[in-house]
Amino acid sequence: MSESSIKIENVVASTKLAEEFDLTVIESQFEGAEYNKQKFPGLVYRVSDPKAAFLVFTSGKVVCTGAKNVADVHTVIGNMAKKLNSIGIKTMENPQITVQNIVASADLHTILNLNAIAIGLGLENIEYEPEQFPGLVYRIDEPKVVVLIFSSGKLVVTGGKTPEDCESGVEVVRQQLDNMGLL
């Protein structure tokens, strides 16, 4: 599978760190935090090492986005909890972190004929309207991911819950294109 190994571009995960948060307190204590409830109901806070962004809500829920791997998600959420504790906001110990979505890219290193692929894959699982979007949207049932296929041979996989889901999605596409003689 080395020809089509994936590169994780973004991991989105969520957790609950407390029963509730006072976002104005967090905004005043966290340098660079942005909170304007007229525009958005959550506080936005970005960190740089590892790089990620948080959406923090009054419900105590936190969404982490922008991490490049699942380990970084755990690291930055742990760091966020420590930082909240350091300003006197108690957080839950060992919060359950749920990966909501992984976006990955891959390259098949070949030019693809999307019209032939659309016909070969059948219309029930694909969307291809080149006048509106240059890629073919392929919905795979197992693993449950969506793969955007571009004529350049580049793929974008979204909807995976694990890196393995994304790898498997790429492998499904590669095998199906190979079976159709389109690789």
From Swiss-Prot:
**Pfam families found in the cross-reference section:** TBP
User: What highest taxon heads this organism's lineage?
Assistant: Archaea
From the UniProt record, list the sequence repeat ranges: 8-84, 99-177
Indicate whether Hydrolase appears among the record's keywords: no
List the keywords (alphabetical): DNA-binding, Repeat, Transcription, Transcription regulation
Q: Which PROSITE patterns match?
A: TFIID
Keyword Acyltransferase carried by entry: no
Q: Which GO terms describe its biological process?
A: DNA-templated transcription initiation
Cited InterPro entries? TBP, TBP_archaea, TBP_CS, TBP_dom_sf
Q: Which GO terms describe its molecular function?
A: DNA binding; DNA-binding transcription factor activity
The family note in this entry says: Belongs to the TBP family.
Q: What's its job? A: General factor that plays a role in the activation of archaeal genes transcribed by RNA polymerase. Binds specifically to the TATA box promoter element which lies close to the position of transcription initiation.
Q: Which NCBIfam families match?
A: PRK00394.1-2, PRK00394.2-1, PRK00394.2-2, PRK00394.2-4
- Protein name, as recorded: TATA-box-binding protein 2
Per the UniProt record, the source organism is: Methanosarcina mazei (strain ATCC BAA-159 / DSM 3647 / Goe1 / Go1 / JCM 11833 / OCM 88)
Lineage of the organism? Archaea, Methanobacteriati, Methanobacteriota, Stenosarchaea group, Methanomicrobia
